[in-house]
Amino acid sequence: GRQLDYFINSGKPYIGYFIVFGTSLVMAIIDTVLLCTMKEKPSLSPAKLNLASLAMPLRDTKYRGFILVLIIWSFTIGLGTPFLPVHLLRNLQLSHTFITAMGIASAVAAMLGTWLWGRMADRYSWQKVFQNAGLVVAAGYICWGFVSKETAVFAAPVIMCAVEGCNGAFNTASLNLQYFESPQSGKTVYLGVTSALANISSVLAVMAGTLITTLLSPIIGEATFNVLLTSSGILCVAVLMTYRLLYKHSHANIR
């Protein structure tokens, strides 16, 4: 972050961006090599799968409702998340150094949050974690809509740490609930299809968010990002309410 600010202020932004890109590329290659060297335990009962198997999660009436909740959640989160860095830099005028520092702090908050939410899951249920962590994430997005240049230095780190401290726990709870809802045989298909559809939903959300910002920017200017982020948070609350209506009792004791 500091080197990026230095090169931008020196009128050589592309050097800073190239350093960031090069570092990220090297780390990605190392990560790929390490993943490829990991040993997997062979499956004791290999399943025979075909293209028709990919439709199994959608045909399963028990699982279909939950996969729909996750698809809509991915869409609502995808509406605002990709535009947050632009909002931080352009509208709130925070430096790359400050944003990087927030990223480090939020990573620490994520580790601490995972431990705290894990204890909550052990004591209560993954449903409680899914709902409560999701509410904090939604509240964070709603709060982004009310952060101004004057309050950004104080409010932005708090919101980012709160959201990241709950985001990992929400995803872990989601995975455990998917595991519970899917049948004993074919869990890989269920989880894989869910992940794929959620990612497709996120891509569509980015396209929708881009269209919204294009239409609203000439009308309300910088407030476009505030509206987009707040709307994303409100929609997240609606998704969580829908989940509660569908699975209030069936997920109550999953640990």
Identify the residue ranges that each predicted region occupies.
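Hydrophobic core of transmembrane alpha-helices in multi-pass small-molecule transporters
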Residues: 153-170
